[in-house]
């Protein structure tokens, strides 16, 4: 809890400083119309829309959400000054009341338009950021490999047993070693198993159909040249980034990360 409070305070401080900087850049008006607060609120709405759209395309860590989403955005979009300014302005005189009414109307309309504009900007930015992922990240990341205490065949059996005990489906197994033998080639023991939960997988495909290319989850048990056995799986969190899944997939991805980790740990361990 303390770490969350610290992150919110840090983000809020940056947000408040940003808001004050914006207000200082706007010249005051002689008729009492709080243009500085209006501009700060419109900019805050634009930033909120942008951050919302960017978060919808990629799953970030809790700390990123806390410091930017809750902290900084909360600091920059402090609408209490908007409400206070409206009341003070309206209570001054009849003419000031009309100015306050116009101020409230313009603030709401401009804020709504700014949010929409920010979301459009965020979506375009997300398209640019995620359209061409670096080839190195595709090749070098996304795989989780752990050493197994068991043979390749037993490791695969343990994957199947644990997956079934957790309510998952085991769809198929592929014995690459046997396939190599049939082809007259040599290959150390290597077996693949495909398993998963259709409830989670369907949610992900409803978000982005292309993730069906990487579903269900695959686990590969293989023996290296020294006789050690390894178990390799795709990291579901990496798959979420690869396919630019949105926040609607967050719960399913977290469940998949937990489930895959549990299966892997059991299959490779004692």
Swiss-Prot record:
The keyword Cell membrane applies. The chain crosses the membrane at residues 4-24, 35-55, 67-87, 96-116. Na(+) is not transported, but it plays an essential structural role and its presence is essential for fluoride channel function. Gene3D superfamilies: TT1751-like domain. Pfam families: CRCB (PF02537), DUF302 (PF03625). It is found in: Cell inner membrane. One of its GO terms (biological process) is cellular detoxification of fluoride. InterPro entries: DUF302, FluC, TT1751-like_sf. Na(+) binds at residues 74, 77. GO terms for cellular component: plasma membrane. It catalyses: fluoride(in) = fluoride(out). Keywords: Cell inner membrane, Cell membrane, Ion channel, Ion transport, Membrane, Metal-binding, Sodium, Transmembrane, Transmembrane helix, Transport. One of its GO terms (molecular function) is metal ion binding. Signal peptide: none annotated. Its main location: membrane. It is a multi-pass membrane protein. Fluoride-specific ion channel. Important for reducing fluoride concentration in the cell, thus reducing its toxicity. PANTHER family: INNER MEMBRANE OR EXPORTED (PTHR38342:SF2), SLR5037 PROTEIN (PTHR38342). Belongs to the fluoride channel Fluc/FEX (TC 1.A.43) family. This is Fluoride-specific ion channel FluC 2. It comes from Brucella melitensis biotype 1 (strain ATCC 23456 / CCUG 17765 / NCTC 10094 / 16M).
């Amino acid at each position: 809890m303390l770490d969350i409070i610290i992150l919110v305070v840090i983000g809020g401080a940056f947000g408040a400083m940003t808001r004050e900087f914006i207000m200082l850049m706007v010249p005051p008006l002689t008729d009492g119309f709080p243009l500085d607060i209006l501009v700060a609120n419109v900019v805050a709405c634009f930033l909120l829309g942008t951050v919302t759209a960017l978060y919808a395309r990629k799953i970030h860590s809790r700390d990123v959400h806390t410091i930017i989403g809750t902290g900084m955005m909360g600091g920059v979009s402090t609408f209490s000054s908007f409400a206070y300014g409206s009341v003070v302005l309206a209570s001054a005189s009849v003419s000031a009341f009309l100015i306050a009414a116009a101020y409230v109307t313009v603030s709401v309309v401009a804020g709504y338009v700014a949010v929409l504009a920010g979301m459009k900007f965020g979506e375009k930015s997300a398209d640019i950021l995620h359209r061409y992922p670096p080839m190195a990240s595709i090749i070098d990341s996304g795989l989780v490999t752990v050493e197994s205490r068991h043979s390749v065949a037993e490791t695969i059996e343990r994957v199947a047993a644990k997956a079934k005990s957790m309510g998952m489906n085991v769809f198929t197994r592929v014995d690459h070693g046997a396939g190599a033998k049939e082809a007259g080639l040599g290959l150390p023991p290597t077996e693949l198993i495909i398993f998963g939960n259709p409830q989670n997988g369907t949610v992900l495909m409803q978000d982005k159909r292309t993730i069906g290319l990487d579903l269900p989850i695959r686990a590969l048990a293989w023996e290296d040249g020294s006789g050690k056995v390894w178990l390799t799986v795709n990291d579901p969190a990496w798959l979420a980034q690869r396919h630019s899944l949105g926040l609607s997939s967050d719960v399913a991805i977290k469940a998949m990360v937990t489930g895959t980790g549990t299966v892997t740990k059991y299959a490779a361990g004692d």
